């Protein structure tokens, strides 16, 4: 079995990006710390074959605990932008990122999560089902609905 330290080193950024996808704020770092502490405490009971989905499920649960406690805020951080060379490219990248973020925020949390896990984190349907604690068929339905709604929202933006 992988050591906890090795696993943390390999997956810390993935966990943080996932938390940011759910919370959309700097509180994602705090939530990730809570999640890693919970993971460390439960490390002995983790299934080595499912460590990634196990950790993402812990992150997800911590995020929803934070949302329930009404401590989450939505911000767009400068550090979320990719490095670019010109001022014009910075503006274009910021506008694209902001537009994508606004579109994602208009999806319900289960749809947004499923889409993020599939398209950004490249998880399989089975892994997403483990993380979201739902059947694979539900994951497929959520992804279909998320893509359909995202396309509809995008078409509305283009038509404006």
Language model region names:
Residues 1-6, 16-34, 42-49, 158:
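Short, charged helix-capping/linker segments at alpha-helix termini
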Residues 12, 16, 36, 108, ...:
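C-terminal flanking helix
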Residues 60, 126, 132-157:
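DNA-recognition helix of helix-turn-helix
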Residues 15, 19, 28-39, 58, ...:
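Short, small-hydrophobic-rich alpha-helical interface motif
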Residues 57-78, 93, 156:
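Arg/Lys-rich amphipathic alpha helix in sigma70-family domain 2
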């Amino acid at each position: 079995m992988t050591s906890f330290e090795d696993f943390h080193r390999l997956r810390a950024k993935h966990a943080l990006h996932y938390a940011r996808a759910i919370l959309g704020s700097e509180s994602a770092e705090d939530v990730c710390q809570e999640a890693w502490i919970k993971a460390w405490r439960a490390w002995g009971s983790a299934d080595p074959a499912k460590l990634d989905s196990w950790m993402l499920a812990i992150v997800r649960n911590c995020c929803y605990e934070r949302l329930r406690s009404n401590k989450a805020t939505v911000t767009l951080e400068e550090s979320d932008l990719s490095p670019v060379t010109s001022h014009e490219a910075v503006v274009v990248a910021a506008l694209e990122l902001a537009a994508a973020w606004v579109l994602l925020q208009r999806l319900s949390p289960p749809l947004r999560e499923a889409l993020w896990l599939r398209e950004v984190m490249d998880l399989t349907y089975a892994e997403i089902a483990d993380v979201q604690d739902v059947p694979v068929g539900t994951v497929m339905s959520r992804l279909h609905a998320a893509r359909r709604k995202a396309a509809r929202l995008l078409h509305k933006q283009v038509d404006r």
